[in-house]
């Protein structure tokens, strides 16, 4: 028989830097989950990733105080800013352009995000990433 699910917890945690301080501790503590067990498991799974890269995670909490978690790919905006070499997007995205990425860079981001995107094919995924980039004030060359 399947375990009874008592809730889902969605967090964004920097890769390799999960610790019991907020937001992780309070979110897991409310459900009575073992915070250190989660932190150790999360840090072990994100060991190969770039340190500090925000990783969305969905934690499923069960009635017996156990849990499972699923990691998603990093947010597209973070990957776009990294590819463009900027710290933040434009305050006026459609008038002030703050950076550029190429179609090849957009394709790399689309491939990394493919599991989390609802696009039918790679070209549609690239257009989705290009739209996100444009709304951040970044031009996409080759589109």
From Swiss-Prot:
One of its GO terms (molecular function) is structural constituent of ribosome. It comes from the Bacteria. GO terms for biological process: translation. SUPFAM superfamilies: Ribosomal L11/L12e N-terminal domain, Ribosomal protein L11, C-terminal domain. Keywords: Methylation, Ribonucleoprotein, Ribosomal protein, RNA-binding, rRNA-binding. NCBIfam families: L11_bact. Belongs to the universal ribosomal protein uL11 family. This is Large ribosomal subunit protein uL11. The lineage of its organism: Bacteria, Pseudomonadati, Pseudomonadota, Betaproteobacteria, Burkholderiales. The gene is rplK.
């Amino acid at each position: 028989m399947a375990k009874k699910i008592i809730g889902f917890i969605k967090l964004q945690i920097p890769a390799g830097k999960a610790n019991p301080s907020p937001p992780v501790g309070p979110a897991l503590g409310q459900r009575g989950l073992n915070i250190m067990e989660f932190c150790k498991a999360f840090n072990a799974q994100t060991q190969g990733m770039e340190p500090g890269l925000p990783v969305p995670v969905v934690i499923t909490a069960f009635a017996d105080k156990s849990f499972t978690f699923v990691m998603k790919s990093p947010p597209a905006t973070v990957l776009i800013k990294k590819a463009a070499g900027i710290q933040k997007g434009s305050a006026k995205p459609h008038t002030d352009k703050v950076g550029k990425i190429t179609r090849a860079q957009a394709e790399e981001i689309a491939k990394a995000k493919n599991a989390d995107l609802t696009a039918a094919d790679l070209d549609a995924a690239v257009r989705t990433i290009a739209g996100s980039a444009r709304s951040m004030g970044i031009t996409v060359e080759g589109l």
